[in-house]
């Protein structure tokens, strides 16, 4: 898990508050709110990591597109590598770049960078618009050298429409 996950309360799929819902039922609920989305709104699939529930995600994305709902995927790009079909139904990717080097990525997440790298390659190949997000964590991702390297890395990507540097915060830390 990422060192600075802001919602560990969502990890359990069996807790007392866990609810199972079909993609069909979800999109039916979402469709009721379509008038509130306006011209620029829609649905954002986030997590945790939405790519870890790829079958549900794909069905929900397809149903959203059939209902005329704009779709956004908020992800760190960690899944099984079968991204093309999911991205066919994704209007915008909010890409959380945890780190831009293999070593740094492993330090932040404890995971291999390859899945995220493959996801980014597919996003670029499919030319899906992308907003980059990066959490600036004191002592971890806030150094000048790191930020310069991140800038160079982001400049190597295409179809990036926006870059957001997000401040690290400790809101909710008392809960965990």
Show where each model-derived region lies:
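Short microdomains enriched in Cys/His and/or Lys/Arg
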Residues: 16-32
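Conserved AdoMet/S-adenosylmethionine-binding subsite of the radical SAM
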Residues: 27, 31-42, 47-171
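Short acidic/His/Gly/Ser-rich catalytic and metal-binding motifs that mark active-site loops
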Residues: 172-176
């Amino acid at each position: 898990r990422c060192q600075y996950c802001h919602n560990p309360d969502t990890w359990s799929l069996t807790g007392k508050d866990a609810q199972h819902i079909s993609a069909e039922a979800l999109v039916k609920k979402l469709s009721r709110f379509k008038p509130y989305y306006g011209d620029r709104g829609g649905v954002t699939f986030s997590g945790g990591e939405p790519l870890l529930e790829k079958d549900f995600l794909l069905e929900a994305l397809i149903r959203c597109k059939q209902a005329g709902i704009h779709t956004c995927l908020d992800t760190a790009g960690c899944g099984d590598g079968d991204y093309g079909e999911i991205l066919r139904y994704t209007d915008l990717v909010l890409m959380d770049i945890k780190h831009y080097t293999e070593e740094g990525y492993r330090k932040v997440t404890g995971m291999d960078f390859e899945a995220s790298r493959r996801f980014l390659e597919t996003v670029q190949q499919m030319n899906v618009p992308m907003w980059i997000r990066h959490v600036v964590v004191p002592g971890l991702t806030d150094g000048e050298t790191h930020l310069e390297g991140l800038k160079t890395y982001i400049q190597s990507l295409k179809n990036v429409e926006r870059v957001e540097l997000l401040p690290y915060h400790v809101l909710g830390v008392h809960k965990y």
